[in-house]
Every structure is written in C-alpha cells, then in structure tokens.
C-alpha cells in the first residue's frame, strides 16, 4: 500500500552520466565512455618467470580481470614480454620505469599498451617523439601514469609537494608532448595514497581533458585499509561519471584486487550483478549464529556465477521482509528457519538444515535461470546477504 503525503515522488536514484572521452582499444578491450568501466590488476610475479606469470594471469582472468599489467625492470623481463603477450587470455600492459628502451621492447613484443612514468624515465621528454611514432605504428595506446611517490622533480619544485594541481599539470604536460607528435591514443592516471587528494586530482583532470582516466589509489595499504580507501575514492568519482578503468592497489594477492574492483562496479550498477549475499550484522535479537551461517552459505555458493540475491537473516525484525525481497532467503528464529523463494515461504527447516537447504534451492534456481537463458555469460561470484 502506498501512502500519499502530498509530496512529489523523488526520481529513482541514478549515477551521473559518464564523462565523454575519446575511445581507445587496449587489445580487445574498449576503454572510454562508450565502453564499460574495466577492472585491471598487476602481476606480482617476476615477469621473466613466464610460466608463473601466465599462471597468475590465468587466475586473474578467472576472477574477472579485464586487463593485466606486468613489470619490466630488467632486460630479461623485456625478453619475456612477447611470449606472455602471445599466450595471455587478456590484454597485457607493460609497466615501464627508468629505462626508455623497454618501452620500445614492449611495443615490439606485441603488448596491448604501455604505461610510462614521466617522473622517473631519464630524459623522457626528449624521447616522446620516438615513443609516439613507435606506438602509433603499432596501433597501441600509451598510459601516462603520474604517481605522487615519483612526481617529476620540476613539478615538485614548483608546488612543493604532490598536490592535485602538480599531478594534473605533470600528466597534461606529457600528453601535450605526445599530441605535438600527432599521437592522441592516451590514457592518464594521477595516483596518490590519500583518497581525498586523489579524488581532487581526478576531478581537476576530468575538467581539463577528454582522455580516458585510469583510477587508482596508489600504495593503498593492506587488504582492509586498501579496500576502504579504494572503494571510497572510486565511489566518489564513478558516481559522478569520472573513470574508465580501475585498479585496486592492495598489499594482498592480486586476485583480491580484482574481487574488490568487481564488487565496487557491481555496487554502483556499472557491472552486471553476480551472486549477492545479504546478511544482517547481528545483534542481541539474533536467535542463530548469523556469522557462521552467512560464512557457510557464502562458502557453499562460491563460484555460482548467477545474479541471485540470497538473504540470510537472524531474527524476525527485518528477516521476513529482507527474505521476501531476495530471490532466496531465510528468516531464522527459535531454532528453525523459514525458507523464502521469490517472496513466498516454501518450507520451514531446523537450524541445522538451513545452509544445506539454501544451497540446494540456489542451485535449483541457477539451473532454471540457465534454462531460460542458455546463452547467458557468467558475470562474477554469487552474492549472499545475511541479516
């Protein structure tokens, strides 16, 4: 029942339109406002260890990574790029610092793009013409990756520290040099470890150019801290239409970066939602062990790549309502659980059978969804909500 209060209904919440950008192709992945926001990560292996690097790329691909970056600090790493680029399932970007000759090695190796750091490549300004010519001939884009920790000393001297203005001016200066040589397939990042400074830098940059932007909070920290920093910064920017690719930088296995990145995009409806688990934080009203129940359901549905919302609720306050709103859910109490499927109670089971029943029903619903849309492409990990 709807109660009218004589007030206009607010519009449905939506994000700001994507900021209009020029379009690039990184391998087979489109980048820019005409394409979905993509998730990137970076290998932690030694690039010259080809087998280990390709194994990690395969793991990242399976986790939903769209583009992968590899380090190239030595000649032996540069020598390995061709084989890695040839066998990788997703586009490979070479990450170049200090030595400009590795830029040309990466281009010759068939990498899908090259990231250059103008702050630490010796005499980079004087080599831009050569880089632009080689990249243009190969048809690959260049990412100008400015980082607060390695900002060009000219801009450090001018601004005193890595301010948003310093980061943006450094990036646009280098972009202008490429443009002077007729090369415009450019993507830019201006990373900082402080999310507030990072957001300000990207807002300033977005207002001053039409290049696609790669978002990142650099050196974000361990998994928990880095996840919070990245989610806050990405949410602030993406909700305003700013950002075309993202990389969550964590002191954690790179697969975790991809999981967080995908979840950020799903949370903003910028990527099709996968399995979602909704669960309550628990309180004194809970009549079951919500933590254990939620974790067991999540583990049992791991890898089920269908857009199901599963609600696991611990009491009768919000439990029935949340369970009815989900595709599948349980409202628990008094040692038992009411199982809901698409808003209807289908059975009541003992507490010991809740997890097993939810998993069985989730598998059944997933099979039905597959029959209705056999060509559907899995889009991530299941989401389970426990309340």
Curated annotation (Swiss-Prot):
SUPFAM superfamilies: Dihydropteroate synthetase-like, Nitrite and sulphite reductase 4Fe-4S domain-like. It comes from the Bacteria. It catalyses: (2E)-4-hydroxy-3-methylbut-2-enyl diphosphate + oxidized [flavodoxin] + H2O + 2 H(+) = 2-C-methyl-D-erythritol 2,4-cyclic diphosphate + reduced [flavodoxin]. The modification N-acetylthreonine is found at residue 2. Its cofactor is [4Fe-4S] cluster. One of its GO terms (cellular component) is plasma membrane. Keywords: 4Fe-4S, Acetylation, Iron, Iron-sulfur, Isoprene biosynthesis, Metal-binding, Oxidoreductase. [4Fe-4S] cluster binds at residues 280, 283, 315, 322. Its EC number is 1.17.7.3. Pfam families: GcpE. Pathway: Isoprenoid biosynthesis; isopentenyl diphosphate biosynthesis via DXP pathway; isopentenyl diphosphate from 1-deoxy-D-xylulose 5-phosphate: step 5/6. It is an enzyme of class 1 (oxidoreductase). Binds 1 [4Fe-4S] cluster. GO terms for biological process: isopentenyl diphosphate biosynthetic process, methylerythritol 4-phosphate pathway; terpenoid biosynthetic process. The keyword Iron applies. One of its GO terms (molecular function) is 4-hydroxy-3-methylbut-2-en-1-yl diphosphate synthase activity (ferredoxin). HAMAP family: IspG. Belongs to the IspG family. Converts 2C-methyl-D-erythritol 2,4-cyclodiphosphate (ME-2,4cPP) into 1-hydroxy-2-methyl-2-(E)-butenyl 4-diphosphate. This is 4-hydroxy-3-methylbut-2-en-1-yl diphosphate synthase (flavodoxin). It comes from Mycobacterium tuberculosis (strain ATCC 25618 / H37Rv). The gene is ispG.
